[in-house]
Amino acid sequence: NEELLQKMVNDKVAQATASTAEEVMGQLFGEDMGVLSAALETLEMEDTDEEYDLEFNLELEQNLYVTLEETMARLEALPEPEPLPYKKNDDKWERFGILLSGIVSNLNSHDLSGMDVEEHIPVMEQKIVSLVRRSWGIDGRSDLLDMIRYLAQEGYILRYQLYSEASSPEELMDETMDEDDRESTSRAWRFAQQYKSQYSPGFMAGWDIGRAAMLTRWGCYLGWITESEARGILWDLSQKVVEELHSWREFAQSYLFGGLMWKLLCGDNSAASYLGYIADAATDLL
């Protein structure tokens, strides 16, 4: 009986690993495709069905603004020690750079103690390869570096700036856009108009840099860049983010802010749950 029970347990573990690897990892954080918290489909949420049935309309948009502001206020209320300045050659920058990937790492139960996100075992390496290829369209070193460069130099900082400066959503549209694209653009434009007087484009730094840091660690784990290169990239990302943001709380709030703009662009009405998962991860880290 004990042997049979153990076999049943082992079979269930193997079945779960095989059936969820691509489904779960293929829905993780990607540019305009995959900023979905890890393994949401494995979590039981009482309101999931109701939320996905909601029609994406102006009322839902306004409700999401309220949810965003309430969630950001929740993070603002958390205690955090005063930031300590580091010298340029301080070894603490290496740890700081790794922690920039903290929110995504927390959602995926990745290791934050060093550069490697997981143990180097075939099943985990295949999961990370699948994630990066399917969600980000990255298939090697060149693609990886191009995406990191894009996030660090343009990303949602530039996108939010363009949407904020446009006098109408039509300025951001062209003849190739279908109706869904136009609705997506209009939602993101309304978001930018709602918050442009409160948050500058630089406030998107946490959203852009956090994802770039995670890609850096994934790329290093897969051997697409060396650990020395990864440390250098994370140092550069660290210098950029501290120019724009002044605390880990603000970093987490930036992640929420950028994440909601992405959800609005995608027309994903699960945004409220998404904000909650991001806030929970940030709370754990803080």
Language-model segments: which ranges?
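Polar/charged low-complexity regulatory segments
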Residues: E2-E227, R231, W235-L286
